Each structure stands twice: as C-alpha cells, then as structure tokens.
Amino acid sequence: MVPAQTREKAASGTFGIDGVYRARVIDKEECTEGGGEYLVEFEILLPQGNVLDIAAQIGSLPLPPYITRSRPKDQDFSALDKERYQTVYAFRDNPVAAAAPTAGLHFSDALLEQLRERGIPQYDLTLHIGLGTFQPIKSTTIEGHPMHKEFYTIPAATREQLEIVKPESSPRLAVGTTSLRAMEDFARRRAAGDPLIPATGSVAATAGLFVYPPQTISGADIMITNFHLPKSTLMCLISTFLAPGDLRGIQWLKEIYTEAVSRDYRFYSYGDAMLIL
C-alpha cells in the first residue's frame, strides 16, 4: 500500500492515491535502531471495498526482502509467487499476515492426508505474521533488541488439545517459528494465570516474546523450521528449542548450519527445512 517513493510522506503523517484512498498515520512507535511500528487510519474513496480489497487490487505480494528479483513488474513471477508463497491450509479469504509461515510451505494436500491416515491429528491457529519477522538484530546485546509483536488466535479445539495432550504419548509439533512463539506465549500466559486468557474457549492474544538461550520452552515438543537469515531473532528461538535452559543450543545450531551449507541445502523462505525432535 505504501510504495518506496511515498515512505517519506507516510513517515510525515499522510499518504494515499487520488480517488482510491487516503491514509493518515495517527500513532507511531519508532525504534532507536531505525524503523518502527505505525498505526494508520484509512479512508476508502471508492464506492465499494475496504482496505483489504484495495490492497488486493493495487498491492504487490510482500515477499521477504532477500528475494531481490523484480516483483511488481514481473507478472509471471508474481502469479507464481501468489501460488507458491502460501500454505495449502491457509484461510485464503482471511488474509491477515504480511508473510507466509514458510515451514508450512513443505506440506501438500497429499502429505496432510497421509498424516491423517496414519492417525496424526492436525490443529489450526491463525498467525498475523508481521514484517518484523525479517528485522535483524542490530543492538550490541541480545537483550537490547526491540522485539516485534504479532497477534494470534487459537481456536477452542486447538486450545483443548494443547492443554490436555501429554508430550510423552503425543508430542506437540509446531510448524514454524511463529507457530512456536504463539504456542509458547499461550503456555506462559496460562501458567502465569494471565487474566486476559479466558478460562475456556478460543484465545486471542499478542505475542511479544523474545526467546533466546538459556530460556526454556514448554509450548511445543517438536518443530519444523526453515534455515534462516544471520542475526535473525528466529535463530535465537531455534537455539533455545534445541537445548532449553542451556547455552549449548548456540553451538549446536552453528554445527547444524555448517552441515546444511556443506550439503548445499537451500536457505530462507523457498528453501529446505529441518525437523527438531
């Protein structure tokens, strides 16, 4: 919605397209390391439609910044990305994320059906993944990094399973780092008796967790994740998952990535994945 050449105007307070929409920045939370979060109020100037409709018509797919080929102008790639950069189980009529949960791109309809036939149940949650997931750590210390926040919803059926399942008999597998962060956020809120978490039913909350060694993780037992960018907060999360409560996960992750490079594994969104048991 905000082309590169209009970002300066957006930062100053207003931007838009004549006859289509006007937008006003009504609040912003800037980071000392650059960037920040903006709360924007939109006014649609067309007879019909809302912000999502306008974005679908004039916007371009928000691919990760490390995919550097021409995106808006290359219609062949654009059509391919719209199909590939989306999980088969996504709620396509509810586009709330700015990025795909890329670990889920490895699952096909056929694979999911095979898992069901083997008695492996699948449970949904909705992730409002933000562009902050691509923000590298720029602070001199891990603790100094301003962690981005992401909204999530856990349906009642999924919540029930997270609460009653016993890891030793039915391990909980998180598909991707954002799923893991949502599950861990829910687990910590529940353990702390967070009043924002209802006693029963679905859960809607915002995960602002920054998980790094030597923290512990109790929200999931197994995870599948892609190979990520250097200086990513996702690397901190994965190293914690590898060795909860210990610093050894840092060295272990380095060894895993060295092995991946030696075997020419593909990295990032369209790359390979690893299963952590």
Descriptions of predicted regions:
Residues 1-277:
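Surface-exposed, charge/polar-rich loops and edge strands
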